[in-house]
Amino acid sequence: GREVARVFRELGVHVNFAPDADVNTNPLNPVIHVRSFGEDPKKVAEKVLAYSRGLESGGVLSVSKHFPGHGDTDVDSHKGLPVLYYNRERLDSVELYPFREMVRAGLGGVMVGHLQVPALEPDAKTASSLSRNVVTGLLKDEMGFQGLVFTDALDMKGVSSVPQLTTKALLAGNDMVLVQYNTANAVQEVLSAVKEGVLSEKEVEAKCRKILTYKYLLGLRQPRPQLQVSGMSYRIHTDEAKALVTSLENTDVKTLSLIDIATI
């Protein structure tokens, strides 16, 4: 985490949409799999905390994803809306466990995924990223998260067809919405929602103040050094970073000796 933060800061990047805090218990998961730290909730949580603390100690905001948990799904939310049918007890012990630990640790950011979780949101048409029950009720109120809340990309098929998408994401409690095909239309949508009383101006201002606070903490007012392209490859690919690359030997696999096919 610290090494990633060092490189990010040199490149002028202050937010990393990582780590993946999903517990990947489904071997058929088409989108998380190797992005996850594994299938054990406690081990995933340990690695999420270590990586996130490394990032934030280096001045880069960590963003744990995909709340409330995308690990046990067989649908890619880029292409559809995955459903988690588990009860609350199971969700608390597996999917939500790493997120609770990162909240307790006081880490900075969470990304909410596009999922349908009946145990948390009874409306089958409302994705977790657009659910006030999930974003505000669970993440903020119950779990006590006070950091920045981001949606996953709103151009993903899990939610992209929802009308008034940006407004619904903000009403759910998200602070920032990611990736709009037409930013100007999204801004106009929010302005109209405020004028019509659908979205509170006070709530929008509170989100803006929160975002500006994090920008300040991440160095908004500090002079931005000019990007030094010369020698960057050597500064990024340090000897220490190379030393972290480990060659693994799989002793369970037996190799077959070659035979002389000419004699067959």
Region spans (language model):
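Second-shell residues forming the walls of enzyme active-site clefts
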Residues: K42-E203
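Surface-exposed helix-capping loop/turn segments at secondary-structure junctions
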Residues: V13-N16, G59-L61, V198, Q222
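Generic helix-packing signal
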Residues: A5, R9, S52, E56-G58, ...
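Preference for extracellular/luminal or secreted protein segments
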Residues: D141, S161-I264
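Flexible hinge/switch segments at interdomain interfaces of large molecular machines
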Residues: D20-N26, F67-D72, M111, R221-Q228
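A substrate-binding/cap region within the structured catalytic cores of diverse enzymes
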Residues: G1-V13, A18-V44, V48, S52, ...
